[in-house]
Amino acid sequence: MANLRKTHPLLKIANDALVDLPTPSNISAWWNFGSLLGLCLISQILTGLFLAMHYTSDISTAFSSVAHICRDVNYGWLIRNLHANGASFFFICLYLHIARGLYYGSYLYKETWNIGVVLFLLVMMTAFVGYVLPWGQMSFWGATVITNLLSAVPYVGDSLVQWIWGGFSVDNATLTRFFAFHFLFPFVVAGATMLHLLFLHETGSNNPVGLNSDADKIPFHPYFSYKDLLGFIIMLTALTMLALFYPNLLGDPDNFTPANPMVTPPHIKPEWYFLFAYAILRSIPNKLGGVLALLSSILVLMVVPILHTSKQRGLTFRPISQLLFWILVADMLVLTWIGGMPVEHPYIIIGQVASVLYFSLFLVLNPLVGWLENKVMNW
């Protein structure tokens, strides 16, 4: 009789995805981030669920309820710190996962890649609405500034903003609906993750040399299940260290002050993981232009597969393209730094140069160098 895990309708799905999945034998630790993102999502949903049991989404009590969680709920401080810093680890893993995809040409699995970009946008939306919930100064003003960007949409902009706010300013209606969204979106993300995996398993994983690996596949379990487990231990250790020793390292001090519509903080800025996009938004001295640049900074990932010109898949054997990739990484770091700086000389011009370079690398330089490298190979 065949094994139950191979015949049972439900277990068969899990078996084909986690046990008997044929996997390239040479995938490196850069392939660990998919499972780490799954772990992040599960940990965020669990800690978030317990926080939601004690949180109240009303402007008069939201800030106090978060303080109550940290002071009076059993291990509430720990749950909150894990949830807040878990978001940072989520984005660290996301950026490394995307960087891996760009470096090794994984984006040529177009459906998987595009669902991945949609997942990225969903996680960004989730993090944004979540940041509003503690109802501190940066929560309130961040919500005001970012939702206000929609007023740049021609003709319907103002109506759109008031519709999202549920009134004429960020108020109780806004907080209540943002809590509803923040509870809902992670489950949408989980659903989209299933699709992401479904499409990935149609083709199988890519690998560091970018060649077809059908001739050399090994079962996912035990080899990669244990490799993933090591990644889990490392990440959970790092998350625990951050949450226990430096819980407020990545937060904004302004968020310890309850929201006050009458007092604007000196520097309104998002969490560190949105700073690169915020820098691109601010580098254009026009509202609609800035909003379009902000959207494009993420959606540009969708055109990467279309602009792939090289005959080789990854950058493993392409030194010039490798240089461009690391320039992109450096550029992202510069943009992240600029996003947290005030709008004054020399930060304005640095941000504008970095923004132009960011789009040039994706849309011009990479396709050009890919084409050039093909010519060199022929020569």
From Swiss-Prot:
In the UniProt record, the signal sequence range is none
Amino-acid positions noted as binding heme b b566 in the UniProt annotation, renumbered to this chain: H97, H196
Question: Can you tell me where the transmembrane regions are?
Answer: 33-53, 77-98, 113-133, 178-198, 226-246, 288-308, 320-340, 347-367
**Can you say where in the cell this protein is located?**
Mitochondrion inner membrane
One BP annotation, GO? mitochondrial electron transport, ubiquinol to cytochrome c
Q: How does it sit in the membrane?
A: Multi-pass membrane protein
Keyword tags:
Electron transport, Heme, Iron, Membrane, Metal-binding, Mitochondrion, Mitochondrion inner membrane, Respiratory chain, Transmembrane, Transmembrane helix, Transport, Ubiquinone
Annotated a ubiquinone binding sites? H201
Q: Which domain of life is it from?
A: Eukaryota
Query: What are the required cofactors?
Result: heme b
At which positions is heme b b562 bound? H83, H182
* MF terms in GO: metal ion binding; ubiquinol-cytochrome-c reductase activity
The UniProt function text for this chain reads: Component of the ubiquinol-cytochrome c reductase complex (complex III or cytochrome b-c1 complex) that is part of the mitochondrial respiratory chain. The b-c1 complex mediates electron transfer from ubiquinol to cytochrome c. Contributes to the generation of a proton gradient across the mitochondrial membrane that is then used for ATP synthesis.
Specify the protein name: Cytochrome b
Species the sequence originates in = Anguilla mossambica (African longfin eel)
Taxonomic lineage from the root: Eukaryota, Metazoa, Chordata, Craniata, Vertebrata
